[in-house]
């Protein structure tokens, strides 16, 4: 019994490689007789290949099936039997000559329908690709929107948490005091000096009012008020020194 692998190897070597080499020699030498011979062989072998494919699926279980295949290929190639030339001249050539016009029409229709089918498949493929791209874009946009929404809700939660903590530390609604720009080094010293000046002026006015209202005070009290007036701080405006006018001293 011959296995299927051995049959395939024999058909490959003697049915394809050997005829292909002889066809090359016929084309190179421009021998018309050999050229026609091998062209008839390839036509018959093409029909054999189609028949073999169908037979392998249906009658490969038949006894001596692979041996019959090898014998048929050898019969086609043998220069004594010339099986390929016999089959072509007796069967294939008359059949193809009678059906040539119909076969040509079928080939033209197949080309046109095949072209239209390919165009339709191409359009459908483009439409499917466009729909898939749009669907993917919409889904990605929805995912991005949900992500941004989750981020915004998280930020609002953080802000509410900060307000809760601030309310916890300042229950009366008082916010944490912040140092303003005006409380820097230069402005704070000027503000402090002006506060001292206003205090001295107020002391001066109050002391004078006390002097004029209470005439029966002792001399020591009047001297104390005069010392307060004399000890007033001088106000500076830039590089100039402002000296307040001295009031006449009152003695009792």
Curated annotation (Swiss-Prot):
Short name of one Pfam family: TB2_DP1_HVA22
Record flagged with keyword Cell cycle: yes
GO BP terms, alphabetized: cell division; endoplasmic reticulum tubular network organization; mitotic nuclear membrane reassembly; nuclear envelope organization
Segments crossing the lipid bilayer: 1-21, 35-55, 57-77
Topological category with respect to the lipid bilayer: Multi-pass membrane protein
Keyword match Cell cycle: yes
Region span, Disordered: 163-225
GO molecular function, a single term: microtubule binding
Cell location: Endoplasmic reticulum membrane
Keyword annotations of the record: Cell cycle, Cell division, Endoplasmic reticulum, Membrane, Microtubule, Mitosis, Transmembrane, Transmembrane helix
Gene Ontology CC: one annotated term: cytoplasmic microtubule
Entry superkingdom: Eukaryota
Biased composition (Acidic residues): 198-211
Function in brief: Microtubule-binding protein required to ensure proper cell division and nuclear envelope reassembly by sequestering the endoplasmic reticulum away from chromosomes during mitosis. Probably acts by clearing the endoplasmic reticulum membrane from metaphase chromosomes.
Protein family membership: Belongs to the DP1 family.
PANTHER family linked to this entry: HVA22-LIKE PROTEINS, RECEPTOR EXPRESSION-ENHANCING PROTEIN 3
Record's protein name: Receptor expression-enhancing protein 3-B
Organism name: Xenopus laevis (African clawed frog)
Gene field: reep3-b
